[in-house]
Amino acid sequence: MVLLESEQFLTELTRLFQKCRSSGSVFITLKKYDGRTKPIPRKSSVEGLEPAENKCLLRATDGKRKISTVVSSKEVNKFQMAYSNLLRANMDGLKKRDKKNKSKKSKPAQ
């Protein structure tokens, strides 16, 4: 997995979307990041220790290539604006789901 800066992550994410435009999927995950790269040992778990600054870890993959970035709380507004514009621009290939007729199954159970 490649850890990139925020701007580089957005450009690589755009490339992933362009590559998967005709066929394929891009999976994006977002989670809280505390700065650790190793797991916490079970016996000495530190529950009261909070990081000085909250961070978010974003990961994106198309199944073959993985990219990730860490966004600090100071730059989250700037990143979110650029990220939302990127998502709006690249989610034009979505298909509407076929809604099944629910009237057949709507009888109340007695």
Curated annotation (Swiss-Prot):
<dbReference type="InterPro" id="IPR003210">
    <property type="entry name" value="Signal_recog_particle_SRP14"/>
</dbReference>
<dbReference type="InterPro" id="IPR009018">
    <property type="entry name" value="Signal_recog_particle_SRP9/14"/>
</dbReference>
<comment type="subunit">
    <text>Heterodimer with SRP9; binds RNA as heterodimer. Component of a signal recognition particle (SRP) complex that consists of a 7SL RNA molecule of 300 nucleotides and six protein subunits: SRP72, SRP68, SRP54, SRP19, SRP14 and SRP9.</text>
</comment>
<keyword id="KW-0597">Phosphoprotein</keyword>
<comment type="similarity">
    <text>Belongs to the SRP14 family.</text>
</comment>
<dbReference type="GO" id="GO:0005786">
    <property type="term" value="C:signal recognition particle, endoplasmic reticulum targeting"/>
</dbReference>
<dbReference type="GO" id="GO:0006614">
    <property type="term" value="P:SRP-dependent cotranslational protein targeting to membrane"/>
</dbReference>
<keyword id="KW-0687">Ribonucleoprotein</keyword>
<dbReference type="GO" id="GO:0008312">
    <property type="term" value="F:7S RNA binding"/>
</dbReference>
<keyword id="KW-0733">Signal recognition particle</keyword>
<dbReference type="GO" id="GO:0030942">
    <property type="term" value="F:endoplasmic reticulum signal peptide binding"/>
</dbReference>
<feature type="region of interest" description="Disordered">
    <location>
        <begin position="90"/>
        <end position="110"/>
    </location>
</feature>
<keyword id="KW-0963">Cytoplasm</keyword>
<keyword id="KW-0694">RNA-binding</keyword>
<feature type="compositionally biased region" description="Basic residues">
    <location>
        <begin position="96"/>
        <end position="110"/>
    </location>
</feature>
<dbReference type="Pfam" id="PF02290">
    <property type="entry name" value="SRP14"/>
</dbReference>
<comment type="function">
    <text>Component of the signal recognition particle (SRP) complex, a ribonucleoprotein complex that mediates the cotranslational targeting of secretory and membrane proteins to the endoplasmic reticulum (ER). SRP9 together with SRP14 and the Alu portion of the SRP RNA, constitutes the elongation arrest domain of SRP. The complex of SRP9 and SRP14 is required for SRP RNA binding.</text>
</comment>
<protein>
    <recommendedName>
        <fullName>Signal recognition particle 14 kDa protein</fullName>
    </recommendedName>
</protein>
<dbReference type="GO" id="GO:0005634">
    <property type="term" value="C:nucleus"/>
</dbReference>
<feature type="modified residue" description="Phosphoserine">
    <location>
        <position position="45"/>
    </location>
</feature>
